[in-house]
Amino acid sequence: MVYKNVKIFLDENKYIENGFIFFEDSMIKSVGDMKDFKKQYEEGGFEDLNGYKIYPGFVEAHNHIGMWESGLCFEGADGNEETDPITPNFRAIDAANPKDEAFSLALKAGITTVIIGPGSANPIAGSFVAIKTYGECIDEMVIKNPVGIKFALGENPKTTYNEKDMTPMTRMGIAALIREQLEKAKRYKEKLNDEDKPDYDAKCEALIPLLERKVKAFFHCHRADDIFTAIRIAKEFDLDLTLVHATEGYLIAKYLKGVDIISGPIISDLSKPEVRQASETNPFILSKNKATVSICTDAPVFPIQYLNLCCAIAVRNGLEKEKAILTITKNAAKVCGIFDRVGSIEKNKIANFAIFKADEDIFSAYVRPSFVVVDGKIVYKK
């Protein structure tokens, strides 16, 4: 299949004004200008998209859809196991329900990839999974599993375990438990090749890919001091760090150059003490200071289908529109460790696209994609 005569977004301020995308077996095989078009590309079928522009399918970098299901209370709440503060062996893939209405809402908004995982009740909460938003069996929707391990600092673990009168009740306790488990996993890993192997430990096993930097360390943090704690722990154990929320990041942006950050939800009330200094300028200031910034909804905290409106708020507060596009494409894939598969339109990546009319503003409340493509198949038409 080939899409031709279409405007193609490649990168910040970089487009092919009249181009083609040739793909087969769900993978992009060739991208180029129409002057380089080969007639044999049409043998598997074609769509003439004159008058349209095409983006990589959008990537929502941090959410919990399918783990807190739409319209349900306890019955659909599967994101926090609040009986043990250290649960790295708990896997989002075993809890996320792809039949949740949020998946189809995301798809209609052009979001083709979501990174889903547990909440922030536990200092080590479990593994995240990157999946496509179209499908019935989650195992067939996987892009990468696990994609990272979730850690949480600050108010949420403190509140959870203070109510149970058990450790951790302080920021000291949270950091100490995280370090203790990471050190256990490190020593466990070192002994696996010994003649006298250690007994199987599910928690340590789950952390081995993290210690080998094969998956990301997603650190939930809002306050500036918690951001610094996340960086400190990541350096101690050589983790591939991504800060999640980083609400006060704009206050310490000079320290965050080169750091991977998922900012959001940008549209939210000041719901608790540690977010009382939240600012809509956060993505702009972090980007200006050379952090790699993505924007998330944290759905269901904010409805996932309005990811584009979150970007619009960031643009209103200083972020360049072209950089805002990166926050839900290239940067989102990079900060989640899946840029080799999604996040841009180039050879050997998955054929996931969001297609709009050429004159439409993709961040407008009045606009949604005309077509959404997953694995090279049109799965939504407006």
Explain the meaning of each model-derived region.
Residues 6-10, 14-19, 346-382:
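C-terminal cap of metal-dependent C-N hydrolases
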Residues 8-55:
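Histidine-rich, glycine-flanked metal-binding segment
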Residues 69-96, 131, 137, 152-154, ...:
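Active-site gating loops and adjacent loop-to-helix segments of metal-dependent hydrolytic enzymes
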Residues 70-71, 77-83, 87-89, 216, ...:
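His/Asp/Glu-enriched, well-ordered alpha-helical/loop segment
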Residues 74-124, 168-194:
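Alpha-helical scaffold segments that flank or form the walls of functional sites
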Residues 92, 186-279, 334-336, 357, ...:
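Active-site core of metal-dependent hydrolases
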Residues 130-232, 236, 300:
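Metal-coordinating catalytic core of metallo-dependent amide/deamination hydrolases
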